[in-house]
Amino acid sequence: MENIETILRLAEEKILLVQNLKALQEYKVEFLGKNGIVTGELKKLGSLNEQERKEFGLKINKLKDKIQNIIRATEEILEEQELKLKLAADKIDLTIPARRYKQGSIHPITQCSEELIQVFSQFGFTIENGPNIENDFHNFTALNFEDDHPARQMHDTFYLKGQENNKPLLLRTHTSTVQIRAMKSGKPPFRFIAPGRTYRSDSDMTHTPMFHQIEGLVIDKNINMGHLKYVITEFIKNFFENSNIELRFRPSFFPFTEPSAEVDIRMNKHDKWLEVLGCGMVHPNVLKNVGIDSSEYQGVAFGLGVERFAMLKYNIKDLRQFFEGDMRWLKHYNFGSFDIPSLAGGLTK
């Protein structure tokens, strides 16, 4: 009995004076471990009779419970103290500037496309989309291309191995294919633009095998070149934010328009004329191919290269730089997310 009380006092003295969890663990092993003091007392049970063993065993268990309670209480106190010390050491200074958050930027082609779409939306144009892989009818035949037209040749067009109705499939060479699909599936009047990727077998400073186009179409009664000239003129002035910009319409030829014109611009009278887009009145054969009566409805169409307009507006010299992925170039020419114009009212996708 006296030995048990002595062990309890010794445990209280040692455990209550410890300063850290490591020392507490050492005392736990000393008193309650496999070879500890309390375990040593339990070994004495074998030398006692049944009644003494019962009484002594009860006392040893109470001693063990008291020591465990002391250790548990001390452990909670030490853990709280260590947590406070850790929080004090890891204290965050809220006045220190935060690390700069990395965020992406807007590619010039995306920026330019959104600006172009926004301007056209002001004239009531909606958006139509179509597939990148097309058949011969939508890409050539319906647009009044003759069978021997150079654009149909392998060196100009990317043909695929697959076929549709025994006709070759190809990567569309213009987004005029969208106009054909829209006119076949709907009824006039139409007023929409068709933005998207197009593909031609060409590569130099001003051409890439893949490029972005926006083509526009208006089909209605009593449409004439005057309407086309007005839309193109106002569009150019709005996009380049220059009301004094000069335009000229040069006679040209496209299979799908008649008459046809190419549009040149110059920012001031000392600059050279720069070709920016093609346009014209929709050819009667095109209207016939999509089931529209050309004696009742007329149309105007135009097409432009997004990269071309981006180069002119943002002063980019080489078309190929758009697709090279040079981080230094992108850092210089890219735009922040808040620079993208929101799509104006009346524009639908």
UniProtKB/Swiss-Prot annotation:
EC number: 6.1.1.20
EC main group: ligase
InterPro entries, per database record: aa-tRNA-synth_II, aa-tRNA-synth_II/BPL/LPL, Phe-tRNA-synth_IIc_asu, Phe-tRNA_ligase_II_N, Phe_tRNA_ligase_alpha1_bac, Phenylalanyl-tRNA_Synthase, tRNA-bd_arm
Gene3D superfamilies: Bira Bifunctional Protein, Domain 2 (3.30.930.10)
Organism: Rickettsia akari (strain Hartford)
Cofactors named for this entry: Mg(2+)
One Gene Ontology molecular-function label: ATP binding
Keyword terms: Aminoacyl-tRNA synthetase, ATP-binding, Cytoplasm, Ligase, Magnesium, Metal-binding, Nucleotide-binding, Protein biosynthesis
Superkingdom assignment: Bacteria
GO biological process, one term: phenylalanyl-tRNA aminoacylation
Protein name, per record: Phenylalanine--tRNA ligase alpha subunit
Family label: Belongs to the class-II aminoacyl-tRNA synthetase family. Phe-tRNA synthetase alpha subunit type 1 subfamily.
